Amino acid sequence: MKVAIIGATGYGGIELIRLLEQHPYFSIASLHSFSQVGECITNVYPHFQNVLVHTLQEIDVEEIEKEAEIVFLATPAGVSAELTPKLLAVGLKVIDLSGDFRMKDPFIYEKWYKRVAAKEGVLREAVYGLSEWKRYEIQKANLIANPGCFATAALLAVLPLVRSGIIEEDSIIIDAKSGVSGAGKTPTTMTHFPELYDNLRIYKVNEHQHVPEIEQMLTEWNRETKPITFSTHLIPISRGIMVTLYAKVKREMEIEQLQQLYEKAYEQSAFVRIRMQGEFPSPKEVRGSNYCDMGIAYDERTGRVTVVSVIDNMMKGAAGQAIQNANIVAGLEETTGLQHMPLYL
């Protein structure tokens, strides 16, 4: 199956290229850029030398439709909203890595993203692509809104608790930490090496755009769920996310019950690995892979459950999950082309 990538020179784009070039079923038909049209991809990223020969093309929907069946949009917020209706109109399937189609309510999108939302008709058509929890909807989708990186790690951690109804609906606290690649390719003062090295920064306190995305999904599974407390931090690593989730249970529990809850929830999910009781993962242990690793603890004194969830933000948090969703759309095994062992060193 032929695929195209729009926004091929960003970090999400080049991770898609790396994965798709090794995929046994998908092949890259074309790469597209806004600012580097006519450049050979190897001139922009020399690590693709002797692997790719693609020249970056302008975005011509009619030409893309002739060559590809699936389009990956690795574009900034706002761009996908303009492009996607045109791609859908010619029969292409779209997997969007931006946040433009994650929110069903355009007013909520505009409040958190500070930009005009996509047209409501297209928003209604979009399926939220959290692979492990939306498989059946994804199978039939023409437009998949790939989840955000923080949202992916957080939702995989909290949804078993929310679905089971065992936690207080107003008690969810999520503390999240990300490597610098999560901020994208464009440099800022905050991501500048001297500013971040040997340092730690909290950002977007109470206003991160993944908050409504997480809350929307939680209320799908339990309408009584209240607003969450969510904080994000930038840490001096290239890639990786660690989410630490806290929630208060409604009644006293045993850690064995919680362990079984998670093992049962993800027993059919090849990319979610639940650690043994008392063990907790670190981002390094999933780096370069599509895995989400989790560890669970329960504090009898406070009645709180703690879940630690780690992913590679460029893989399970972006390109890896996008290809996992493309596999589902194509009727392939979810693991096809994604069976990479983590790169520990």
From Swiss-Prot:
Q: What is its EC number?
A: 1.2.1.38
Entries under Pfam families matching the protein:
Semialdhyde_dh (PF01118), Semialdhyde_dhC_1 (PF22698)
Q: Localized where?
A: Cytoplasm
Q: Which of UniProt's keywords are assigned here?
A: Amino-acid biosynthesis, Arginine biosynthesis, Cytoplasm, NADP, Oxidoreductase
As its record notes, the protein acts as a catalyst of: N-acetyl-L-glutamate 5-semialdehyde + phosphate + NADP(+) = N-acetyl-L-glutamyl 5-phosphate + NADPH + H(+)
Cite the active-site annotation: 149
Q: Which GO terms describe its cellular component?
A: cytoplasm
What SUPFAM superfamilies does this protein's entry cite? Glyceraldehyde-3-phosphate dehydrogenase-like, C-terminal domain (SSF55347), NAD(P)-binding Rossmann-fold domains (SSF51735)
Give the function comment from the record: Catalyzes the NADPH-dependent reduction of N-acetyl-5-glutamyl phosphate to yield N-acetyl-L-glutamate 5-semialdehyde.
> Belongs to which family?
Belongs to the NAGSA dehydrogenase family. Type 1 subfamily.
Q: What is this protein called?
A: N-acetyl-gamma-glutamyl-phosphate reductase
Write down the species: Bacillus thuringiensis subsp. konkukian (strain 97-27)
Encoding gene, per UniProt annotation: argC
